[in-house]
Amino acid sequence: MWRISRVELENFRSYRGAHRLELGDVNLLWGRIGAGKTSVFYAIEYALFGQQLEVKERVAKLADLIHSGSHEARVALELVDGANVLKVERKLGKRGAEKLVVVHNGVELRGGEAERRLEELLGVDEDLYERLVYISHRTLEGFIYGTSQKRAISVDRLFGIDVIDGVVKTVSSAEKALLGKAEELRKRLAAYEKYRDVIKRYGGYSGLVSRLRALSSEIEALKEREAMLTRTVEELARARAAYLAKLKEHEQILLEYYRARSELEFLESSAGGEVDVGALEKVKAALREAAEEFEHMLDPGILEKLYKASDLEALSVAMAEVYDALTRVAKDLELELTDVKKAYEEYVARARRLEEEVAAAEARLRRLEKPFLRFQELLKKLRSLEEARARLSEARRRLSEAEREAAYYTSLKTVALYLAETNASVCPICGSPISREAVEKVVRDIDEKFGGVVKRVEELREEVKALEREVEEMEILQGDAAEYIAAKARLDELKVEREEVVKKVLQAEKSVRQLEKRIEKLREFFAKVDKRVISDAVSRYGRAVRIRELRKRVKELEERLRQAGIGGEELEVEVKWREAAAELEKAAARLAELYKEKSLLEEAAREVGEEAEGLKKRLDNVLYAYGRLEELKSRLELAKVSARARLVEVVRSRFNEVFQSLYKYGDVVKVDAAVEPSRGYYDFYAISPSGDRYGVSRLSDGQRLSIALSLALALREISQVKLGFLIFDEPIPYVDVNVRKAFAQLLTSLAGRYQLLVATQSREFAEEVREALPNAKLFTVVKDGASALIEGLQS
């Protein structure tokens, strides 16, 4: 592993000029606060990485590494690893220009190639260096004296997972910005609600902005018009002053003339020329025609008012009433058409269902027709099922009698044949003497007399079988026949109902056509005549009448003024002056309105900023992003806790080995580490020889220092850093005797494995190190305007 054999500084931080430091295995720099001890360590870091912690953390700038009053700083290191020698030299100019020279075993490299080769040889980046090589009092102090949270931060820094906290802080900053943006958007949405009516008036926010732009042009144009009218009024006022006395004498006539003429000009300009007085008659005729068409649906008094209207006002009211009545008729017809269409659709649907039912009934009849015809055939033959059953019963009775009779004669014949075959001489029944001839004669008599009985039995049996089949068939077919009759009756009912529904369909269809025709007539009427047309016709008619009256009155007043000595020129000037003054007043009033409107719109535009949908969408996006960041923070915290637990597991074994090699007192035999489940903090426990567990809070400062160093050194060994030196920058900032002694003993243990560089402001600690490590190289750092290095402890 690489060890530093020499450090050279030139115009670096507090060091002016060139300084050289030859290092041994254990090196201790002692000096007061600000003397320049840390500058030596900064020089080592800068030489190796071209960077420095304070610069990276933006506490300082690279240019601050150059001594005040100098233009360039230089740092050089010589590192050895067995036979390998590595020389590194960096120069830094005031303008940030940097030069690097690396010499490895006599091979010189410069620039980017030198940076790459140096990184390869060191095998460590500046982050790992600051965690596991350069151990400052900030790292150890957080573990020794800090709370659980501060201790967690210190250990995280050693593990290298403090970067997660940096990400979390960045995420939190982004969240804060998002919350601010969300609040701004909510205020804009609230402002949108505040100015909703104003925005709606202009058709949305874009319309409001367009109107605001148009207002500026309109205001400028109106201001120019106001200035022009002011000049005109002033000129006319000067011309008017010559005959002002005469004008005042006839002021009342002039005022009346001016009013009449102004009204006449207004009516003529709005009329756009001569008015067709017949337009009102056309509208009236159209209303009368439509009203007569639907007279049966109107109140008779309405038409009478239309016919008898004697003046324009009465006619206007009557026409409006007729129009409203026709509007109601149209609505009633629309409702009636809707009902009739609904009924028509229901009838059509019912007719279709009946067609389907009739078809089903006919199919059922066809299926039952053959069984029914067979049943009818059997009825025709047997008349009825009951009669057939009676005939079957009678045939069975006759068959039974015939079978008994046949059985009797068969028995007699059997006995006679037996007697004949056995040559019996005595009758076995009555005991009378018999002969063979008599017996044979009896057999012949039986055959002659009763031979037909057997034949009759066979015939009766056939008759019974035939009747049984027919009765059974009738019983089976009886249900089908009844079903056929019922189906036929249902079919007849369905056909009758279908005819009635078809009639209703045709009737409803006819009604629909009639209603549509009547509604279409009303639509054609309303397309030509509406309230606006009526009002326009009435107003045009009234305007025409008023124009005639005003023309007549203006001529009369002009004649009176001419007789009073006020001719055309004076009158023209007076009228123009009054018109210009009125226009000027209107322009001023309009300008005030526009300024007021512009002020309101500017305020709304400033507070709202855009359309509500855009604001809502942006707010949703901001809140969604905030939610995702919250989720990311939660996942990062979980990842940090998981990383802590995993790293504790990885380092636990080696951590204890290092601790046991450093801590030789025997009162603590083992240190256990775990991650607290609830908050994710680290828990460190010291275990005594008896197995008792003690939390970090119950340990001494020296014991905590041993744990912190053991953790740092264990991590360093696991990380396989190629640098064989350790730097302790003010590891014990306080002058506690126990802490000094404990750390001096730890240095004794570490000296066998690492090159040590220690900076302290405590002379007592320096003395203890010299006592514990007689071979240690001690340097005194002094400062008198600039820093200087003196070998040995100076008083």
Curated annotation (Swiss-Prot):
Say if the entry is tagged with keyword Transmembrane: no
Query: Which is one GO molecular function term here?
Result: ATP hydrolysis activity
- Which pairs are disulfide-linked? none
Just give the chief location class.
cytoplasm
Q: Where in the cell?
A: Cytoplasm, Cytoskeleton
- This protein's UniProt keywords: Coiled coil, Cytoplasm, Cytoskeleton
Tagged with keyword Chaperone: no
Q: Where is the signal peptide?
A: none
Residues in a coiled coil are: 205-253, 323-412, 450-618
Query: Record's Gene Ontology CC terms?
Result: cytoplasm; cytoskeleton
| One GO biological process term | double-strand break repair
Top-level taxon of the source organism: Archaea
| Functional summary from the UniProt entry | Part of an actin-like archaeal cytoskeleton.
What more the UniProt record tells us is: Belongs to a conserved five-gene operon within Thermoproteales denoted Arcade (actin-related cytoskeleton in Archaea involved in shape determination).
Would you tell me the protein name for this molecule?
Arcadin-4
Q: What is the lineage of its organism?
A: Archaea, Thermoproteota, Thermoprotei, Thermoproteales, Thermoproteaceae
